[in-house]
């Protein structure tokens, strides 16, 4: 089975759109517009924040559907940033097109998550060493049963965190297709199995990277505590995630 099974119709009547061609259906960047390593926040505004605050000579390279991508340099190394939108279906589109059409080899997701583990604090940064999910996406695309990050990227992030004094926790996250869970059953079940937090994209990233032979890692800042009910405000979120973003960028240039 060839994945993804794209079903839009071309002008030539072939009935398929290849994601090996540029621009792709969802990215209007030119050939060579992306670096080999991409930081991937969910929020397009966070992509802009990364570009404006951390990158030198950052240029907007894609803006289809308001999903923004930039390329610039960080400490002299070329790095790109590309938003994924929310959830696995959206993230899967951008991950696939970046890897297949634009020569991207590494994607580091930099996002936020809700805390499942009672002893995990708000603002804690977590590197996802695995992902479990209620989505069928990994099975549909033929991904391995175990969804894990690139060992090299994970080791690099841990090394950079230690060198820069960043407290980095590691563990499994739950990638959910449902933001508004109808009850706490899933949280209690996953907490019992040692899952640290819940988010909505990592399983897709790890699954597609495995199928495509690419490297991937997720870094998450804990912004909502589903045990205590604590939440960070929008302003607190922005200030808090900068430490994670710098860790992601330093990992990107150190690998």
Report each predicted region and the residues it spans:
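Metabolite-binding pocket within alpha/beta catalytic cores that recognizes anionic/polar moieties
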Residues: 17-156
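Generic non-transmembrane alpha-helical segments
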Residues: 156-164, 208, 247-254
């Amino acid at each position: 089975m060839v994945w993804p099974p794209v079903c839009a119709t071309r002008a030539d009547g072939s009935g398929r759109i290849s994601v090996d061609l540029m621009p792709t259906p969802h990215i209007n960047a030119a050939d060579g517009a992306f670096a080999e390593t991409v930081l991937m926040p969910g929020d397009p505004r966070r992509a802009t924040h990364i570009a404006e605050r951390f990158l030198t000579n950052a240029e907007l390279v894609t803006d289809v559907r308001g999903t923004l991508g930039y390329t610039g340099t960080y400490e002299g190394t070329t790095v790109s940033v590309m938003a994924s939108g929310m959830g696995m279906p959206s993230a899967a589109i951008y991950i696939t097109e970046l890897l297949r059409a634009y020569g991207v080899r590494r994607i580091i997701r930099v996002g936020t998550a809700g805390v499942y583990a009672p002893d995990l604090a708000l603002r804690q940064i977590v590197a996802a060493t695995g992902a479990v999910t209620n989505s069928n996406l990994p099975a549909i695309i033929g991904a391995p049963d175990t969804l894990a990050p690139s060992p090299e990227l994970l080791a690099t992030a841990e090394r950079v965190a230690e060198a820069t004094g960043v407290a980095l926790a590691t563990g499994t996250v739950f990638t959910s297709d449902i933001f508004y869970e109808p009850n706490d059953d899933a949280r209690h079940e996953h907490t019992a199995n040692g899952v640290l937090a819940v988010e909505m994209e990592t399983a897709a990233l790890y699954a597609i990277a495995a199928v495509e032979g690419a490297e991937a890692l997720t870094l998450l800042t804990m912004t909502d505590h589903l045990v205590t009910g604590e939440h960070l405000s929008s302003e607190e979120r922005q200030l808090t995630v900068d430490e994670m973003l710098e860790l992601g960028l330093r990992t990107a240039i150190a690998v």
